[in-house]
Design a protein with these regions (language model features):
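Membrane-embedded alpha-helical bundles of multi-pass transporters/translocases
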Residues: 1-199
Length: 199
């Protein structure tokens, strides 16, 4: 999901949200869209203490889904998309800052049961997955836009991308998140219920 978002954001800012190399759309998209993470450093702990990490993360993914839906209302409207990105990022605060803590708890539990630490193995697996997914997402994205008729800009001409290319870019940047966030929230809730039964 994040890999598809990263692969398509440059194209989304250039061909859907703004105009080619306008110099500000991508900066606004990242700077304003990710700004709540700065405040999130302070807010995350009280929220997670009040709700619990699992509930805070599940609720955050639901809020992130709402933010993505705001973006999908009008994917070419800069103000609306920025508002949606802010809501999405606020929703992602618990997962952004708590996922490492939860991984640490899981590693401690593995050590308690097996008497062995597996930090190195888990780090290696995570790095492999991140690297592979980045490459796979870029391949899927480039294949998709090339098959749908993407026209690269030249020194003399800045083309207008057809609707199919624009819709594919929107799907990669926003649509994939809209599909994933509710599923992740449900998985988080299911994991919490399973954890309660095991205790």
């Amino acid at each position: 999901m994040n890999a598809m978002f990263s692969a398509g954001t440059f194209y989304y800012c250039n061909w859907v949200l703004g105009s080619y190399n306008d110099g500000y759309t991508q900066a606004l998209f990242y700077a304003l869209g990710q700004a709540p993470l700065g405040i999130g450093i302070v807010l995350c702990r009280p929220i997670c203490n009040k709700l619990g990490r699992g509930r805070a993360m599940a609720g955050g993914f639901v809020l992130a889904f709402a933010g993505v839906l705001i973006c999908l209302l009008s994917p070419g409207n800069l103000a609306l998309v920025l508002a949606g990105q802010v809501v999405r990022t606020i929703g992602l605060i618990p997962s952004t800052f708590m996922i490492s803590s939860m991984l640490g708890d899981a590693l401690d539990e593995v050590e308690q049961v097996s008497k062995k630490r597996c930090d190195g193995f888990s780090s290696s697996v995570m790095n492999c997955i991140t690297t592979l997914m980045g490459g796979i997402a870029l391949c899927i994205f480039n294949f998709g836009i090339s098959q749908l008729g993407y026209q690269a800009p030249t020194e003399t001409m800045i083309p207008v991308q057809n609707d199919a290319v624009q819709n594919f870019i929107i799907f990669c940047v926003i649509g994939v998140q809209a599909l994933c966030y509710p599923v992740i929230a449900l998985l988080q809730l299911a994991a919490m219920k399973k954890g309660k039964k095991m205790v």
